[in-house]
Every structure is written in structure tokens, then in C-alpha cells.
Amino acid sequence: MQVLHLCLAVSIAVALLSQAAWSEEVFDDTDVGDELTNALESVLTDFKDKREAEEPSAFMTRLRRQVAQMHVWRAVNHDRNHGTGSGRHGRFLIRNRYRYGGGHLSDA
């Protein structure tokens, strides 16, 4: 959503700049250039601050989920009656057992 806002702000700024260039307005006589520059700088800094604040938590959430899934599948694959995953066909035995109704695992 933030990327959409950033793209929208940049496209509006480019449209205004191109309109001003085609109508040959000079930015020195008006405050349009300064206003556009300030608006773009504020949008970019706001986007950068939010992205840096949100990405580490999202990354850690994804990493925790992957680690949890790894532990779940390691526990599922550790079975003495069927393949342990170390043999040649062990993973196929486990996969087929869970695919055809032997065990039920919900992948959260």
C-alpha cells in the first residue's frame, strides 16, 4: 500500500513538472518547484522510515514461521517405522503416507 502511495505521489509530481515545463512556467517566479520538492522529500522520508521500521519485524515473523515449519517437518519425518529421510526412498514413504490419509498434519 505504501508503494502504491509512493508511485502515486511520484506520478503526480512528474505530471505537474511536465505540465509546467510545457507551459514554460519558470519555477523561480513561483513556489511550485519548492512545494513539489518538499512534498516529494517528505513522502520519500516517510516511506523510508516506515519501511525500515516494518521490515525487520516482518522478516523475523517470516523467519520464525520457517523455523517452526522446519521443526514440524523434522518431527514428521522422524519416524522409525517408515523412512527417516536419510535413506534413498525415505522421503517418498513419508510423503505418500501423509498424502494418502495415514497421518494428518495442518501446515500453519
Swiss-Prot record:
UniProt modified residues of type Pyrrolidone carboxylic acid: 66
GO biological process: neuropeptide signaling pathway
Post-translational modification: The partial formation of pyroglutamate from N-terminal glutamic acid in peptides isolated from single cells is detected by mass spectrometry. There are indications this modification depends on a heat sensitive factor.
Main localization category: secreted
GO CC terms, sorted: extracellular region
Subcellular location: Secreted
Positions of post-translational Pyrrolidone carboxylic acid (Glu) modification: 24, 52
Signal peptide residues on this chain, from the entry's feature table: 1-23
Source species, domain of life: Eukaryota
Keyword terms: Cleavage on pair of basic residues, Neuropeptide, Pyrrolidone carboxylic acid, Secreted, Signal
Tissues in which the protein is found: Neurons R3-R14. A cluster of 12 giant neurons located on the right side of the abdominal ganglion.
Function: HRBP is a myoactive peptide that excites Aplysia heart and enhances gut motility in vitro.
Name of the protein: Abdominal ganglion neuropeptide R3-14
Organism the protein comes from: Aplysia californica (California sea hare)
